[in-house]
């Protein structure tokens, strides 16, 4: 029972981290956003986030871009 509780807690926290944009997955959004600084939008966002690790910044930038894209082009 204790092991199950630990596993469920880990899955919950992992899902929350993915939702919030933390870099817990190695490839995160590599299929939807070009490598860091090769994409002008990612580069501009990441340069403004001084002091944050590149992995976090990359994930955050990709999630932000995807969110804006989905809001802008959502079919009604």
Swiss-Prot record:
This is Putative sodium channel toxin Ts36. Gene3D superfamilies: Knottin, scorpion toxin-like. Belongs to the long (3 C-C) scorpion toxin superfamily. Sodium channel inhibitor family. Putative sodium channel toxin. Its main location: secreted. Contains 3 disulfide bonds. One of its GO terms (cellular component) is extracellular region. GO terms for molecular function: sodium channel regulator activity; toxin activity. It comes from the Eukaryota. It is found in: Secreted. InterPro entries: Scorpion_toxin-like_sf. The keyword Secreted applies. Disulfide bonds: none annotated. Keywords: Disulfide bond, Ion channel impairing toxin, Neurotoxin, Secreted, Signal, Toxin, Voltage-gated sodium channel impairing toxin. Transmembrane segments: none annotated.
